[in-house]
């Protein structure tokens, strides 16, 4: 972007997937892959093609693919949870079943600094992006049914992070008795500010994971974006 080159993303190739997972299946008794949402990415479909070929080459391969219906730290946190279950001696089926439930116990609140990248990526119409920019409207986005969806809106430029945290606290599903957060950002200062605010409110241990948007998600959310994943109460 700094060089004036437009941002774009491309799915990982079949051959890269194949070589990587072939090696993993040879080195491990079982392999579980949590794929990006199939509704928004071709990775899940590519992984299934790779799985079929690997199983033809190696009938003993125990390769499982899970459509996470999510992105980013959702998947990272679920992978950590799966690894702990494996250490505890849980079976592959138990791990997959539990993780499919576990990933739904987090809710995403994503705030972007500019609407430009959402418009470029087709997530927002040009008209909506223009009106939103003119009126200083910032959409709060979330992940529903495997896609980025609008959850709410904030107006103005001041104290946006305070307003975002207030929205989270007003969520009827927010687990206020045991608050846990995952933070991912494309602006370190903003990320640290959110961490400080949450720790002041809920204690040092409330943030379970902190990270930076990778190039794939960063392409679509742009600089200055921040997502807070919140542990919610589920039935």
What is each stretch, according to the model?
Residues 2-3, 27, 102-105:
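Structured helix-beta-strand junction loops
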Residues 39-43, 47-53, 57-64, 70-235:
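Mixed-charge interfacial surface used for oligomerization/domain docking
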Residues 16-47:
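N-terminal glycine-rich phosphate/adenylate-binding segment common to multiple enzyme folds
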Residues 1-16:
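N-terminal glycine-rich anion-binding loop in soluble enzyme alpha/beta folds
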């Amino acid at each position: 972007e700094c060089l004036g080159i437009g941002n774009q993303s491309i799915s990982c190739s079949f051959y890269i997937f194949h070589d990587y997972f072939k090696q993993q299946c040879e080195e491990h008794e079982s392999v579980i892959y949590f794929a990006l949402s199939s509704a928004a990415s071709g990775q899940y479909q590519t992984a299934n093609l790779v799985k079929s070929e690997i199983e033809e080459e190696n009938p003993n391969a125990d390769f499982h693919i899970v459509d996470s219906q999510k992105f980013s730290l959702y998947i990272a946190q679920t992978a950590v949870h799966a690894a702990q279950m494996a250490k505890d001696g849980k079976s592959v089926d138990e791990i997959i079943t539990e993780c499919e439930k576990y990933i739904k116990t987090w809710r995403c609140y994503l705030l972007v600094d500019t609407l430009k990248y959402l418009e470029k990526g087709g997530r927002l119409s040009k008209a909506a992006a223009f009106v939103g920019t003119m009126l200083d409207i910032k959409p709060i986005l979330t992940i529903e049914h495997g896609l980025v969806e609008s959850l709410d809106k904030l107006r103005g430029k001041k104290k946006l992070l305070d307003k975002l945290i207030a929205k989270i606290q007003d969520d009827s599903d927010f687990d206020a008795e045991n608050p846990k957060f995952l933070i991912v950002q494309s602006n370190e200062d903003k990320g640290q500010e959110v961490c400080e605010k949450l720790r002041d409110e809920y204690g040092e241990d409330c943030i379970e994971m902190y990270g930076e948007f990778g190039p794939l998600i960063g392409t679509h959310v742009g600089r200055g974006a921040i997502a807070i994943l919140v542990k919610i109460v589920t039935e």
